[in-house]
């Protein structure tokens, strides 16, 4: 059943997939829509959950509006309230995963938040592990230029999304988590295909930096855990059953 929730004057499209049991709120990635979750939502219903998926502002059938993390979290809160979701598990992919991680910092009652392969983009030379200072500076400059060129012609609201991502310190967000937070990584090598060959070493260096930062966070006393799946950037589309098993393992430990 598809409905609308108005959050701060913005209509937010919401799809309740039915089912009974633990509520699960599903957040899609940037430039995508709630339909990405259809197959996974069906699996959740069959395993005793009630999944609800929403279109983030500016996406799918939701209204376009200024974009910020605070406004996105307000939209999520409005959906939770209007649909009567009780302490929902919040699972997000990419952009939605970052929203889920921020939710974890504000909702200690949340049983689990999941960031599914939402690692952001490199913005500083120190994020290119294994490259010396000069090569790291060059890698950062070339990567920034490439990503900027990719953004040409995109609508302003989406460019604002990208600026919000670039300004977010995800590892500070992880360290601020107040409920269990699972960060899931796909195979970063599969994502390297979007870059020209000259930038693949830089991308790999950034992925190495990300893994090391995640290892540091999970070694600290914190509610953050990390897991990997042998998929690309879209585990919920490529292997939804593997993602379900991972989720069940977190919520129903043996």
Show which residues each predicted segment covers:
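Conserved HGGG/HGGXW glycine-rich cap/lid loop of the alpha/beta-hydrolase fold
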Residues: 13-61
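Active-site loop/oxyanion-hole signature of alpha/beta-hydrolase fold enzymes
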Residues: 42, 46, 53-91, 231
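Short beta-strand/loop motif that positions the catalytic acidic residue
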Residues: 177, 183-185
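Gly/Ala-rich beta-loop-alpha elbow adjacent to hydrolase catalytic centers
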Residues: 92, 96, 100
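Catalytic active-site module of serine/aspartate enzymes centered on a nucleophile-bearing elbow/loop
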Residues: 221-254
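Active-site nucleophile elbow and catalytic-triad environment of alpha/beta-hydrolase enzymes
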Residues: 156-173, 209-212
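Conserved loop-alpha-helix segment in the C-terminal half of the alpha/beta-hydrolase fold
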Residues: 187-231
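Flexible "cap/lid" loop of the alpha/beta hydrolase fold
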Residues: 101-105, 110-142
């Amino acid at each position: 059943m598809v409905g609308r929730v108005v959050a701060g004057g913005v209509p937010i499209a919401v799809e309740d997939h039915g089912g009974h049991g633990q509520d699960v709120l599903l957040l899609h990635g940037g430039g995508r829509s709630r339909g990405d979750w259809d197959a996974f939502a069906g699996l959740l219903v069959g395993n005793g959950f009630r999944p609800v998926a929403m279109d983030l502002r500016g996406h799918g059938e939701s209204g376009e509006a200024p974009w910020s993390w605070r406004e996105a979290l307000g939209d999520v809160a409005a959906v939770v309230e209007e649909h009567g979701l009780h302490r929902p598990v919040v699972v997000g992919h990419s952009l939605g995963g970052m929203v889920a991680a921020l939710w974890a910092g504000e909702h200690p009652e949340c049983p689990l938040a999941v960031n599914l392969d939402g690692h952001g983009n490199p913005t500083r030379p120190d994020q290119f592990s294994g490259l010396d200072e000069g090569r790291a500076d060059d890698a950062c400059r070339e990567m920034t230029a490439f990503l900027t060129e990719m953004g040409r012609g995109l609508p302003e609201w989406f460019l604002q999304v990208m600026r919000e991502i670039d300004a977010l310190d995800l590892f500070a967000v992880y360290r601020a988590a107040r409920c269990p937070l699972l960060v899931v990584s796909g195979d970063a090598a599969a994502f390297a295909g979007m870059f020209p060959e000259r930038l693949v070493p830089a991308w790999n260096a950034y992925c190495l930096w990300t893994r090391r930062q995640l290892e540091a966070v999970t070694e600290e006393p914190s509610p953050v855990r990390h897991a990997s799946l042998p998929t690309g950037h879209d585990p919920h589309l490529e292997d939804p059953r593997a993602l379900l098993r991972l989720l069940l393992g977190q919520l129903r430990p043996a």
